[in-house]
Curated annotation (Swiss-Prot):
Keywords: Host-virus interaction, Inhibition of host innate immune response by virus, Viral immunoevasion. Plays a role in the inhibition of the host RecBCD complex (also called exonuclease V). A double mutation in this protein and the nucleotide kinase gp1.7 protein allows phage to overcome the retron Ec48 bacteriophage defense system. Overexpression of the wild-type gp5.9 protein in E.coli with an intact Ec48 retron leads to a dramatic decrease in cell counts consistent with cell death, the L23P mutant does not have this effect. It comes from the Viruses. This is Probable RecBCD inhibitor gp5.9. Coiled coil: none annotated. GO terms for biological process: symbiont-mediated suppression of host innate immune response. It comes from Escherichia phage T7.
Length: 52
């Protein structure tokens, strides 16, 4: 399998990197929200089961 090389202008590359960075930050934020939601659900389950 051969690979073709493509030249990407520096400003386009920087834009792509910036977009990737913003996606990584958004992903981290969503992971944190999910962990908080999991903790909240666990607390609700404890209350529902009368173990709190």
């Amino acid at each position: 399998m051969s690979r073709d090389l493509v030249t990407i202008p520096r400003d386009v590359w920087n834009d792509i990197q910036g977009y990737i960075d913003s996606l990584e930050r958004e992903n981290d934020s969503l992971k944190n929200q999910l962990m908080e939601a999991d903790e909240y659900v666990a607390e609700l389950e404890e209350k529902l089961n009368g173990t709190s």
